[in-house]
Every structure is written in C-alpha cells, then in structure tokens.
C-alpha cells in the first residue's frame, strides 16, 4: 500500500480538489414552445430544434 512521504498542506489539498465540484446540467429553450429541456434532447412535447420529431400522447 502506498504511503505519502510528507503531509499535504491545506492549500495543496484544496488545489487537488478544485475541480471536484458539481456543475448544473446544460439546459436549452425550445424556440417553438418555449419549454426548457436538456441540450441535444427532445422537449417533453416531442420537438427538437423547432420541428416536431415524435408523436406524443396529446397529439
């Protein structure tokens, strides 16, 4: 098992963890309906980039 030779200082520990934060999901707004959805995914109404691509139960 590996054992560190010297204790890592709080500053170095913070630098090591600096990229471990969570980011929010990239969201997009559908231009035709105004709904918010994940980028590169269809909206709940079945629209993608302003065009109807999937029939939904409401159609």
UniProtKB/Swiss-Prot annotation:
SUPFAM superfamilies, alphabetized: Zn-binding ribosomal proteins
Alphabetical list of Pfam families matching this protein: Ribosomal_L32p (PF01783)
Region (Disordered) residue spans: 1-59
Statement: the UniProt record of this protein carries the keyword Ribosomal protein: yes
Keyword annotations from UniProtKB, A to Z: Ribonucleoprotein, Ribosomal protein
BP term (GO), one: translation
One example GO MF annotation: structural constituent of ribosome
Cellular component, GO annotation: large ribosomal subunit
Compositionally skewed regions (Basic residues) per UniProt: 49-59
Family per similarity comment: Belongs to the bacterial ribosomal protein bL32 family.
NCBIfam families: rpmF_bact
Protein known as: Large ribosomal subunit protein bL32
Taxonomic lineage of the native organism: Bacteria, Pseudomonadati, Pseudomonadota, Betaproteobacteria, Burkholderiales
């Amino acid at each position: 098992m590996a054992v560190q030779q010297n204790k890592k200082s709080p500053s170095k520990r913070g630098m090591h963890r600096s990229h471990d934060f969570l980011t929010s999901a990239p969201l997009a707004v559908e231009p035709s309906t105004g709904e918010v959805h994940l980028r590169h995914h269809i909206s709940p109404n079945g629209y993608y980039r302003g065009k109807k691509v999937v029939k939904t139960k409401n159609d």
